[in-house]
């Protein structure tokens, strides 16, 4: 029954994140899909779809937020397309993965707040919760870019902000990763695989064997 229903309507595993989050590189590492990875942030500038299994499609969304080397008009158009895709396809998104650069979280957040803006990373997680009715998988990427103490401080602040000061209720949904060292990637694969299987889908995400 699951296979028949899935084949009738595409369902999506959606990856979101700012242009410099390392989103597309993470997708490639997790899934083994042949995704083009650019040398500069913001390479993904359109909605890209990749079939995973019967009825299941991975969606790599463009980076949300400020883009380097493009006009403000183009940047706004891309950002509008991201939000429109998420809102119009919310009922068909079975899993959302929000990726962000944990190494610069506080620095970027404080800079935005001085200008009267909310953190794009926090805003996206809350937005996904609102339209999907469940907490997304959140990936705090690039933990190798700063000292452990800085990463811990950034992560603690992020958890407090997305949970209204109750970090323990969201901690299990947040995974720390480094593509450079591979740390945390196996655990993230396990989590995505388990969630998709629980919803009746076959996945290409390899489960890390326990020692």
Residue ranges and their predicted role:
Residues 1-76:
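Conserved G1/Walker A P-loop phosphate-binding module
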Residues 20, 188, 211:
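P-loop NTP-binding site
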Residues 32-33, 43-44, 74-77, 114-116, ...:
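Glycine-rich, phosphate-binding/catalytic loops in enzymes
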Residues 43, 63-65, 101-105, 143-146, ...:
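Conserved nucleotide-binding/hydrolysis micro-motifs of P-loop NTPases
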Residues 81-170:
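Conserved C-terminal guanine-recognition region of P-loop GTPase G domains, centered on the G4
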